[in-house]
């Protein structure tokens, strides 16, 4: 739904800045809650929140791409101050070094973080499902031995089922995040190539100026 809303609507820079700030704040809150959670079931909504935040960020990517391609010829701040600030931090005073650093960060994000976390989620889900029959048998054995009552047995069964559902949801969410990372890389190339084409052919910019504007905006995005 957020993507469908983002396609026809062209966000002004100030609104895009506010939306990006909300997205960053929301992501930091999720990270802090996850770090300070002792039991996974205490934060069982994490896969759903991860999916929602990824969809929201993808919608913002679409909106920022539209703004970059349509207003990028106006300069570095054409897509708002948030994108410009991030680009300035990465690029510094040297666009070549900034571009190399940006490519390294993209590779680390996709190859190391995204693929690694996806593999971890997949293995965790597999081991949890494989261990499910053994845990059920252990609960039945404790119940038959009189170590626990029927109510405690039901609570334990409910807990292990919830854990299995959580890890299964995390496996699915990690695949969605991996797709989002691939989409982000494609959007990056679209911003650069499309920006150069729009800037040079439609807006009358020279190639070096167009490359400077649209490359910095893409890095910030």
Language-model segment annotations:
Residues 72-83, 130-174, 205-210:
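Non-transmembrane, extramembrane segments of multi-pass ion/lipid transporters
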Residues 68-92, 197-221:
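Membrane-interfacial helix-loop-helix connectors in multipass membrane proteins
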Residues 15-27:
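Structural signature of hydrophobic alpha-helical transmembrane segments
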Residues 8-18, 36-42:
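Short, hydrophobic transmembrane alpha-helix segments
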Residues 19, 57, 120, 173:
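Residue-level signature of catalytic and energy-coupling elements of molecular machines
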Residues 2-7:
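Short, small-residue-biased leader/transition segments that mark boundaries at the very start
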Residues 15-18, 62, 66, 115-127, ...:
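Membrane-spanning helices that line or support transport/gating and their immediate boundary helices
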Residues 162-192:
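Transmembrane alpha-helical segments and their cytosolic interface motifs
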């Amino acid at each position: 739904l957020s993507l469908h809303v983002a396609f026809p609507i062209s966000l002004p820079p100030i609104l895009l800045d506010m939306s990006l700030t909300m997205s960053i704040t929301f992501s930091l809150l999720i990270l802090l809650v996850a770090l300070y959670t002792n039991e996974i079931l205490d934060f069982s909504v994490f896969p759903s929140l991860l999916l929602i935040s990824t969809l929201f960020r993808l919608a913002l990517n679409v909106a920022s791409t539209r703004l970059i391609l349509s207003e990028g010829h106006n300069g570095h701040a054409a897509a708002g101050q948030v994108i410009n600030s991030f680009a300035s931090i990465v690029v510094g005073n040297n666009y070549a070094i900034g571009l190399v650093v940006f490519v390294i960060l993209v590779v680390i994000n996709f190859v190391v973080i995204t693929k690694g976390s996806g593999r971890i989620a997949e293995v965790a889900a597999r081991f949890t499902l494989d261990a499910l029959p053994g845990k059920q048998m252990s609960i039945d054995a404790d119940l038959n031995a009189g170590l626990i009552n029927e109510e405690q047995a039901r609570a334990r069964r409910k807990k292990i089922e919830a854990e299995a559902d959580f890890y299964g949801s995390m496996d699915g969410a990690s695949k969605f995040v991996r797709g989002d990372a691939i989409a982000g890389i494609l959007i990056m190339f679209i911003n650069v190539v499309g920006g150069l084409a729009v800037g040079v052919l439609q807006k009358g910019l020279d190639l070096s100026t167009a490359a400077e504007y649209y490359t910095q905006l893409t890095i910030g995005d």
